Amino acid sequence: MATALCPLRALGQTAFRPRTRRLHLSAPRADAVVISGRKLARQIRQEARHEVEQWVAAGNKRPHLSVVLVGENPASHSYVLNKTKAAADVGISSETILKPASITEEELLDLISKLNNDANVDGLLVQLPLPEHIDERKICNAVTPDKDVDGFHVINVGRMCLDQYSMLPATPWGVWEIIKRTGIPTLGKNVVVAGRSKNVGMPIAMLLHTDGRHERPGGDATVTISHRYTPKEQLKQHTIRADIVVAAAGIPNLITADMIKEGAAVIDVGITRVQDPITAKSRLVGDVDFEGVKKKASYITPVPGGVGPMTVAMLMKNTIIAAKKLLKPKALEALTA
């Protein structure tokens, strides 16, 4: 009889255990603990590096990540560079395939098909956003699900919503790991997720509200989702009662100190480039008024240096999952046996 393997551990996805879940969170603090996403990401990348070393030492092929980058968007080029640097850091080989913004949708689909069928490619992602003439949803669904390290394919999204094993989207998984590794309890807690995007807000809500005893980790929280049509005063009515607020709307200063109760944990996923009124230089800001909110919150993530580094780290973990083919049908059967 085969030795039982913890399925969540095999996927690198772990859940809170009931004995570690605390029911207290909102005790007043003088100032928030600023969670360093960079520090947590270094820890995860170290784990990934060790996992790759063990995998290769066992005689397996080194994991390989292919990134398709379309156009000349400076932010996209910067993000892709960060991803390939992280891959090199953990021992994953990678390539960036550059294509002009004039590429047709058919040509891009043909390229993805070739990469899907390339046995040397373990993980595959197409950097978003894409030019307006290309259907992003069609492109995301063209990537084969077990190579879909972004976790955007409809099959991976569907499996995640059904609490089944799937390739988790990197940013939501990064938010989950921040909460879990920081020790912020979620069992029975009130959570507000500001933002309902299919790649960020919705998956974060799914991870936080589902049953922690199921295949895929869940936080057992009571989750409220707001969006662009939620009036600010109505949003405040929800956030003022929330133990955890996750801001993922892409609206600078959406969450202010008067909207947060004492001792709440605040995770800022938003990232917007604005011009500093004093220096006239551009800088990155989140959705949260950091200076004001940190005086009331118990935990808070900064922008930059919070969720961003975690997104890249979780992408590396997904590439390893893809290389080990843990989401192939036969592997899934073994995990659930």
UniProtKB/Swiss-Prot annotation:
- Superkingdom of the source? Eukaryota
Locations listed in the record: Mitochondrion
Query: InterPro entries per the record?
Result: Aminoacid_DH-like_N_sf, NAD(P)-bd_dom_sf, THF_DH/CycHdrlase, THF_DH/CycHdrlase_cat_dom, THF_DH/CycHdrlase_CS, THF_DH/CycHdrlase_NAD-bd_dom
Q: Which GO terms describe its biological process?
A: tetrahydrofolate interconversion
- What's the protein called, per UniProt? Bifunctional methylenetetrahydrofolate dehydrogenase/cyclohydrolase, mitochondrial
Q: Which PROSITE patterns match?
A: THF_DHG_CYH_1, THF_DHG_CYH_2
Record EC number: 1.5.1.15, 3.5.4.9
Whether Transcription regulation counts among this entry's keywords is no
Cofactor names from the entry are: Mg(2+)
- Name the gene that codes for it: MTHFD2
Q: Which GO terms describe its molecular function?
A: magnesium ion binding; methenyltetrahydrofolate cyclohydrolase activity; methylenetetrahydrofolate dehydrogenase (NAD+) activity; methylenetetrahydrofolate dehydrogenase (NADP+) activity; phosphate ion binding
Q: Could you tell me what reaction this enzyme catalyses?
A: (6R)-5,10-methylene-5,6,7,8-tetrahydrofolate + NAD(+) = (6R)-5,10-methenyltetrahydrofolate + NADH; (6R)-5,10-methenyltetrahydrofolate + H2O = (6R)-10-formyltetrahydrofolate + H(+)
Chain sites annotated for binding NAD(+): 195-197, 228
The function of this protein is:
Although its dehydrogenase activity is NAD-specific, it can also utilize NADP at a reduced efficiency.
Q: Which organism is it from?
A: Gallus gallus
Q: List ligand-binding residues for substrate.
A: 79-83, 126-128, 304-308
Transit peptide interval: 1-30
* A cellular-component GO term for this protein: mitochondrion
Query: What's in the keyword line of the UniProt record?
Result: Hydrolase, Magnesium, Mitochondrion, Multifunctional enzyme, NAD, NADP, One-carbon metabolism, Oxidoreductase, Transit peptide
Instruction: Fetch the HAMAP family from UniProt.
Output: THF_DHG_CYH
Query: So what family is this one in?
Result: Belongs to the tetrahydrofolate dehydrogenase/cyclohydrolase family.
